Regions:
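N-terminal membrane-anchoring alpha-helices
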Residues: 1-46
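Membrane-embedded segments
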Residues: 48-143
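Short loop/edge segments at beta-strand edges and connector loops
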Residues: 146
Length: 146
């Protein structure tokens, strides 16, 4: 009887942990925006620091809301960056996504003193995204490195 109770408890605990991980993975983590600050270089330098904002892995998909992108843009602009660097994975699957004009409009709102730079992510190649990724990033004011 004790073994059965322990087994039931273990199964219930395992189920709750699994459900919690799935909930976190699909409902919390994709919408987190984290800002980390790093100071690099000589501390005694008299040069003004350069502020670089890096954005990555937005993974736009059919249930992606523009509120999320707007939050990212607002947060980045509040940091007053000298450069914005987008390091890929704009799309989750481009073939399932079609509202490029709204996306371009939002990305254009990113401001950087010296420019915006983008590189390709592994997800930016499939589903017809190669052609569109380059077009969208360039129309949004990014210099796409090849």
């Amino acid at each position: 009887m004790k073994i059965l109770k322990k087994l039931i408890f273990a199964v219930c605990l395992l189920f709750l942990l699994t459900a919690g991980c799935i909930f976190y993975a699909f409902r919390i983590e994709p919408f987190r925006i984290s800002v980390n600050t790093f100071a690099m270089g000589a501390e005694e330098s008299s040069a003004e620091p350069v502020k670089i904002v890096q954005i990555s892995d937005i993974h736009i998909k059919e249930d992606f809301t523009y509120k999320n992108l707007e939050k990212i843009v607002e947060r980045c602009n509040r940091l007053s960056p000298d450069f914005v660097v987008f390091t890929g994975d704009l799309y989750d699957n481009y073939a399932k996504y079609s509202d490029d004009s709204h996306l371009i409009s939002e990305l254009k709102k990113l401001h950087a003193e010296y420019g915006k730079i983008a590189i390709w992510g592994n997800r930016d190649y499939g589903g017809g995204a190669v052609r569109k990724y380059q077009e969208i990033m360039e129309l949004s004011g990014f210099t796409l490195l090849k």
